[in-house]
Amino acid sequence: MSSVSAAGATPPASPGCIAGIGMDLLRIERIERALARHGDRFAQKILGPEELAKFHARRRRDPARGVRFLATRFAAKEAFSKAIGLGMRMPMSWRRVQTLNALGGRPVLVIGAELADWFDARFGAAHVSITDESDMAAAYVIVERKPAPDGRP
């Protein structure tokens, strides 16, 4: 909910304010069916290069873990596309944003060069949270407003 001033106008945002929120929830079996139907082409269409390497490594060790990995990354990309207000249309595409892990394991969004200029001109930081449990995978993305050049709201 946005606050409204007495004059009826929305007050200006301060740096670090939320510009967009995206969420995606999906059944993991949906990803299993897509993999069964399309094989590795499905993973190659969805995942960026680092994600794809991790997917193959996890799937070799445990096929179910590979599917869960793909499902969480699919959800993160959907959530990100919603947070930035584009959906899956240019300059956004599946492979132009990856969800990788920081040293401590925290998921981080890595925006590819083809999308970075567009994103950086409009937004500040992006944050992601992903989870999977039982038969579901989910992701939440929060995108911050771009701070003003002088740092003022």
Swiss-Prot record:
Q: Which residues bind Mg(2+)?
A: 24, 78
Q: Does the keyword Transferase apply?
A: yes
What GO terms fall under cellular component here?
cytoplasm
Question: Sorted alphabetically, which Gene3D superfamilies does this protein's record hold?
Answer: 4'-phosphopantetheinyl transferase domain
Q: Which Pfam families match?
A: ACPS
What does the record give as EC number? 2.7.8.7
Where are the membrane-spanning stretches? none
Q: What class of enzyme is it?
A: transferase
Offer one example of a GO biological process linked to this entry. Answer: fatty acid biosynthetic process
- Cofactors demanded by this protein: Mg(2+)
- UniProtKB keywords: Cytoplasm, Fatty acid biosynthesis, Fatty acid metabolism, Lipid biosynthesis, Lipid metabolism, Magnesium, Metal-binding, Transferase
What reactions does this protein catalyze?
A: apo-[ACP] + CoA = holo-[ACP] + adenosine 3',5'-bisphosphate + H(+)
Name the major location.
cytoplasm
Q: Does the keyword Lipid metabolism apply?
A: yes
For molecular function, the Gene Ontology terms on record are: holo-[acyl-carrier-protein] synthase activity; magnesium ion binding
Question: According to its UniProt record, where is this protein located?
Answer: Cytoplasm
Give the similarity note: Belongs to the P-Pant transferase superfamily. AcpS family.
Query: Main role?
Result: Transfers the 4'-phosphopantetheine moiety from coenzyme A to a Ser of acyl-carrier-protein.
Q: What is the name of this protein?
A: Holo-[acyl-carrier-protein] synthase
Q: Which gene encodes it?
A: acpS
